[in-house]
């Protein structure tokens, strides 16, 4: 799940805007008690595991790991009940799986003795090596659409870093760079595979770009001094930020499917980072509203800002669902923040002391990690509804 579409959006934005602070008090209908965590375990002989992606059916992909130095990472898949399966690594013994689509098809890469090789695994876990043009190398696939279009990044024959895409039939396309430049990165893709979000260099600064229907690279904020917008939901709405002048304040924003920009409330001259955009347009991130303290924050589909309750102790937010439920951590415990103002810390594994939530689905599954009684870190999931 890397996952909007909102109704009306405000056309004007002001640094003087008011924002809401969640106190953690229950202000609406009580939420169901979360169930879990369910320990997803590791492959035999491994120590730790983590979930990197989950689809709406609850199928999860991630890593099973062993050894501190060097650490061996193996791609794995868990079915919705939590049964683990090793994904094959043709030509190597290690690799990573980075994303999974609605149909259970996942992508990542396998590490061979000399190279990173992009790989796709079908819903049954069978591996296919994705072809790379002659001279291109160290290619890693990082996201896949529901239509089977995969994206990632590779090194060109002259060792330049470029974004690329693979069509469902395996045809590879270099996505190119901005005129006169040498670097680009593909970071996310819409559910229909038509819009790819990423970054590229121009005049020594990073710039948010996108590719539509495999077309040429275009800038999302061409008048800005710098920008970045690598978060995209299934509807093709992109989230990121920009700086209009070298010394100007950061401006968080979303871009509609047609490229129309909407500035999000941010009454601060200090840094802000956007981490995830949900399927209906909620956005989460962190930033310094009142430096030096950093806040976990949420924007609704109209761009209104909410500071997530942290009792002035700090919190991290990673993801948000269609209903505005945010997932992350507070006081080293996996935590969700509901739109009615309730903050709920999720359960721990027996004997464990900490946890972290990384993703949340619209169907109510939260995935993350939690410590075991022996100090290992295991992939886990909780159920909200």
Predicted regions and their residues:
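Residue-level hotspots at or immediately adjacent to binding/recognition sites across diverse folds
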Residues: 31-385
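Secretory targeting and sorting signals
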Residues: 2-32
């Amino acid at each position: 799940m890397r996952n909007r579409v909102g109704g009306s959006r405000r056309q004007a934005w002001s640094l003087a805007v008011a924002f809401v602070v969640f106190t953690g008090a229950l202000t609406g209908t009580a939420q169901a008690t979360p169930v879990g965590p369910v320990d997803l375990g590791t492959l035999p002989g491994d120590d730790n595991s983590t979930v990197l992606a989950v689809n709406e059916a609850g199928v999860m992909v991630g890593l099973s790991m062993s050894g501190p130095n060097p650490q061996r990472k193996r791609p794995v898949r868990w079915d919705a009940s939590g049964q683990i399966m090793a994904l094959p690594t043709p030509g190597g013994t290690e690799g990573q799986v980075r994303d999974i689509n609605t149909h259970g098809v996942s992508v990542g890469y396998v590490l061979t003795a000399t190279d990173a090789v992009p790989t796709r695994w079908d819903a049954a876990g069978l591996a296919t090596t994705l072809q790379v043009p002659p001279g291109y190398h160290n290619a890693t696939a990082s996201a896949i659409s529901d239509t089977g279009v995969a994206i990632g990044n590779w090194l060109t024959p002259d060792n330049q870093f470029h974004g690329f895409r693979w069509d469902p039939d395996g045809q590879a396309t270099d996505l190119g760079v901005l005129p006169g430049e040498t670097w680009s990165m593909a970071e996310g893709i819409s559910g229909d595979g038509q819009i790819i979000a990423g970054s590229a260099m121009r005049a020594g600064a990073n710039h948010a770009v996108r590719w539509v229907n495999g077309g040429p690279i275009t800038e999302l904020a061409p008048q800005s001094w710098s920008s970045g917008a690598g978060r995209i939901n299934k509807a093709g709405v992109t989230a990121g930020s920009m700086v209009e002048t070298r010394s100007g304040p950061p401006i968080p924003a979303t871009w509609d499917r047609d490229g129309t920009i909407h500035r999000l409330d941010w009454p601060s001259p200090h840094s802000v980072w956007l981490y995830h955009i949900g399927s209906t347009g909620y956005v989460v991130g962190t930033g310094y509203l009142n430096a030096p303290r950093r806040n976990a924050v949420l924007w609704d589909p109209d761009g209104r800002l909410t500071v997530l309750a942290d009792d002035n102790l700090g919190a991290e937010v990673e993801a948000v669902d269609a209903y505005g439920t945010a997932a992350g951590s507070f006081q080293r415990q996996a935590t969700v923040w509901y739109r009615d103002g309730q903050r709920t810390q999720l359960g721990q594994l027996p004997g464990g002391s900490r946890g972290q939530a990384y993703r949340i689905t619209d169907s109510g599954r939260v995935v993350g990690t939690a410590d075991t009684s022996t100090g290992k870190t295991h992939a886990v999931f909780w159920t909200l509804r």
